[in-house]
Amino acid sequence: MAYTHRQLFQKFMAPTSDAPLALEITRAEGVYLYDSAGKSYIDLISGIAVSNVGHRNPSVVKAIKDQVDAYMHLMVYGEYIQSPQVKLAEALVKSTGTTHLNQVYFTNSGTEAVEGAMKLAKRFTGKTEFISCFNAYHGASQGALSIAGDENFKNAFRPLLPDIRHIHHGCIANLSKITKRTAAVIIEIVAGEAGIKTASPSYFQALRKRCTETGSLLIIDE
């Protein structure tokens, strides 16, 4: 028996929500998705911002094809010198406009980046307390989920990591919760899950100052 793609989706794909959209997308171009019936949809998700320059962007497609013609996956952990990787690392370092953020460790996802940053913070400071914001979301792995600021994400997976505290995004008065026990504060410049909230430059300046005073690292998630 030959299954349709929809049947394969329902039979073999582990569900991630109670009511998936289940659109069968056959192609994408620019801001549009096209289903198996040819109907077009404006893509307001964009792969959660992965496709932020549009689907099948000609410059991106060319870069991918050029790289495939040279080589694809070689090795992780920085063992080999790979031209695209080292050029991107240089560009990222230069984009920070600082002298102390001078090296890059690449990961496959934002969640992995958060996990790596938490491990580094614990190792560097010797402390275990982390502070994040209420309603924040930093990923679904064990460590990243522990610092989530919404209990709805966490209650099915407890016990999680201990020594987690929360502050309100943009509230300078809350910064007193950062103490010498704090390994790191992790925060989004734009709090996406909390409703696309931003904070003033003075808030982030005060946050940076407080972390310096307490010997806590400051982790910026995207």
Q: What is the role of each PLM region?
A:
Residues 22-44:
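Active-site and channel-lining beta-strand-loop segments
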Residues 51-52, 81, 173-174, 192-197:
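Short, small-residue-enriched loops and turns at beta-alpha junctions
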Residues 90-187, 191-193, 205:
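PLP-dependent aspartate aminotransferase-fold enzymes
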Residues 197-222:
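Catalytic PLP-binding core of fold-type I/II PLP enzymes
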Residues 42, 187, 220-222:
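Active-site flanking residues adjacent to catalytic metal/cofactor-binding acidic residues
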Residues 40-127, 131:
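Glycine-rich loop-to-alpha-helix module at the N-terminal edge of alpha/beta enzyme cores
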Residues 1-29, 84-85:
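Active-site-adjacent loop/helix segments that line or gate small-molecule/cofactor pockets in enzymes
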